[in-house]
Design a protein with these regions (language model features):
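Charged, low-complexity intrinsically disordered regions
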Residues: 3-5, 16-202
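Membrane engagement elements in two modes
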Residues: 10-11
Length: 202
């Protein structure tokens, strides 16, 4: 174990245990490589975990954050960093809303079903700074992802973040928990989320 630690640094479980202790969160390690960190924020629970996608010859690991909440008006958004093919995608008709902050607009593709609320959400400087601090990001409000039946009750959506790889940077993980808290609060201020428990356990 000492040699492995020298080669690869602290394990994910060690890092996540430290994170939970510093945030007053719950860390539930899993012997088989899963595990999660959960923190209660008001009526919501923000969950950090990982998942794996196997494509035959290769296996891809992802870090994700989720926070189910009662969506008051069906508002959705999606944000990710621009890349080399963004220009082509926009030419082919991909939506890219401008939020009114030049540096942010130049760095990110922002999509949503209510442009006024998208601009109001990202008018929050704290939200923009936390998003800009992420080297990679796929952050959105998305609906129920059950293939054959609903996982969440009617009216419940989730705030969702994912990125390739396993994040073991404590400060970055703290920033992501903070981002979720700020966005949930802002969604409430915009009338797009209810301050009630979604009655969902992850």
């Amino acid at each position: 174990m000492g040699i492995l630690r020298q080669l690869f640094g602290p394990s994910r479980d060690e890092i996540w245990s430290q994170l939970a202790a510093e945030l007053g969160a719950r860390h539930e390690p899993n012997f088989w490589g899963g595990g999660k960190v959960q923190i209660d924020y008001g009526e919501w629970t923000i969950t950090l975990d990982t998942y794996t996608v196997s494509t035959g010859k290769t296996t891809h690991h992802y870090t994700r954050f989720r926070a189910p909440y009662v969506n008051a008006d069906g508002f959705r958004f999606d944000i990710h960093r621009k890349h080399i093919f963004t220009g082509l995608s926009k030419w082919l008709g991909m939506q890219d809303l401008e939020v009114g902050h030049k540096e942010f607009d130049e760095a990110f593709v922002v999509q949503g079903n209510d442009e006024t609320k998208v601009r109001a959400l990202f008018a929050n400087e704290g939200i923009r700074k936390l998003i800009a601090a992420q080297p990679a990001i796929a952050f959105s409000v998305r609906g129920d992802q059950g293939w054959f039946s609903r996982i969440y009750p009617d009216g419940v959506d989730e705030l969702y973040f994912q990125v390739g790889g396993i994040i073991k940077d404590v400060e970055r993980l703290k920033e992501l928990f903070a981002l979720f808290g700020l966005v949930l609060d802002q969604l409430c201020e915009l009338g797009s989320a209810y301050v009630t428990s979604p009655q969902v356990k992850l």
